[in-house]
Curated annotation (Swiss-Prot):
Domain of life of the source: Eukaryota
Lineage: Eukaryota, Viridiplantae, Streptophyta, Embryophyta, Tracheophyta
Functional summary from the UniProt entry: Involved in lignin biosynthesis. Catalyzes the final step specific for the production of lignin monomers. Catalyzes the NADPH-dependent reduction of coniferaldehyde, 5-hydroxyconiferaldehyde, sinapaldehyde, 4-coumaraldehyde and caffeyl aldehyde to their respective alcohols.
Entry cofactors: Zn(2+)
Species name: Saccharum officinarum
GO MF term set: cinnamyl-alcohol dehydrogenase activity; coniferyl-alcohol dehydrogenase activity; zinc ion binding
Xref: PANTHER family: ALDEHYDE REDUCTASE (PTHR42683)
Name recorded for this polypeptide: Probable cinnamyl alcohol dehydrogenase
Enzyme class, UniProt record, top EC level: oxidoreductase
Length: 365
């Protein structure tokens, strides 16, 4: 086992204000503990939430902030009480790096619903030090919140599964929507949505992609394997699809109407919200009453579910569709993501970007 230094200086790319612009930043990692692992970051996916946080869309951002919560790296040191991992293991770190371990969600192993969870960035750890994410050379993480990347899964492919992949896998499992033959829809074809198509198809579902235009039809059906494509602005097609779906996985991260989609659900159908939306959504109650339909939500997934989806993707031969970029391109990547100009997930090659070298003259804390 490697020995742990109490503190260490590392380099990340941080936003310093609500412009969301990232630049090199040198900071001190939190003190390490006996159950901590030190992870050299190899790759980190870019999620739409990174934009929300970096630009303070949710009104709770603290700066400087190093984003990134789809982290894949190599264990380089372990604490004396670490039992799950060893030096050289390739591991993943997701959205959460701490929880209370005492509440009902924690005891049920769905720690993502713990009211005292600690986010992997833009939060404060138990020692009072800010948490910083995976757009950095190194992270220190408690072993409970680390997952081993299975053999057969490339690290850059694994990164989006730590958020986008488990975000669609978790509600399908939690709401009993894993039975082959179900008819489901994925609303929105971005980073989360494209994994939704792949995961649902691998479960044996008939999958419809719903989008606002026809421009993604060929991608959805020819490349991702969707069974049908529905344009939400096509009133005739929407009417023809009424009462046809067991579920809708709604990945749209901006305000949108719900009523057109509720009409597509069968009796007892579920509309599952996954997008982080800061404005109220509205519907009239008969839309759910006259069909015993449910509007519900789901938030990422547990550590156990994340490990499950990683293995599920290996077993089913699933990969995420990614564009790998260097850290120096991260601001352009964030801009493109905000314009929905990516198919379908950016992944930053952190280890290959020499972030330590480019930060020689960077400001520090």
């Amino acid at each position: 086992m490697g020995s742990l230094a109490s503190e260490r200086k590392v380099v990340g790319w941080a936003a310093r204000d609500a412009t969301g612009h990232l630049a090199p930043y040198t900071y001190t990692l939190r003190s390490t503990g006996p159950e901590d692992v030190v992870v050299k970051v190899l790759y980190c996916g870019i999620c739409h939430t990174d934009i929300h946080q970096a630009k303070n869309h949710l009104g709770a951002s603290k700066y400087p902030m190093v984003p990134g919560h789809e982290v894949v790296g190599e264990v380089v040191e372990v604490g004396p009480e670490v039992t799950k991992y060893g030096v050289g293991d390739v591991v993943g770190v997701g959205v959460i790096v701490g929880c209370c371990r005492e509440c009902k969600p924690c005891k049920a192993n769905v720690e993502q619903y713990c009211n005292k969870k600690i986010w992997s960035y833009n939060d404060v750890y138990t020692d009072g030090r800010p948490t910083q994410g995976g757009f950095a050379s190194t992270m220190v993480v408690d072993q409970k919140f680390v997952m081993k990347i299975p053999a057969g899964l490339a690290p850059e492919q694994a990164a989006p599964l730590l958020c986008a992949g488990v975000t669609v896998y978790s509600p399908l499992k939690a709401f009993g929507l894993t039975t082959p033959g179900l008819r489901g829809a994925i609303l929105g074809l971005g980073g989360v949505g494209h994994m939704g198509v792949k995961v649902a198809k691998a479960m044996g579902h008939h999958v419809t992609v719903i989008s606002s235009s026809s421009k993604k039809r060929a991608e959805a059906m020819d490349h991702l394997g969707a069974d049908a494509y529905l344009v939400s602005s096509d009133a005739a097609a929407m009417a023809a699809a009424a009462d046809s779906l067991d579920y809708i996985i709604d990945t749209v991260p901006v305000h949108h109407p719900l009523e057109p989609y509720l009409a597509l659900l069968k009796l007892d159908g579920k509309h599952v919200l996954l997008g982080v939306i800061g404005e109220p959504l509205s519907f009239v109650s008969p839309m759910v009453m006259l069909g015993r339909k449910a509007i519900t939500g789901s938030f990422i997934g547990s550590i156990d579910e994340t490990a499950e989806v990683l293995q599920f993707c290996v077993d089913k031969g699933l990969t995420s569709q990614i564009e790998v970029v260097k850290m120096g391109y991260v601001n352009e990547a964030l801009d493109r993501l905000e314009r929905n100009d990516v198919r379908y997930r950016f992944v930053v090659d952190v280890a290959g970007s020499n972030v330590e070298e480019v930060a020689a003259d960077a400001p520090s804390n």
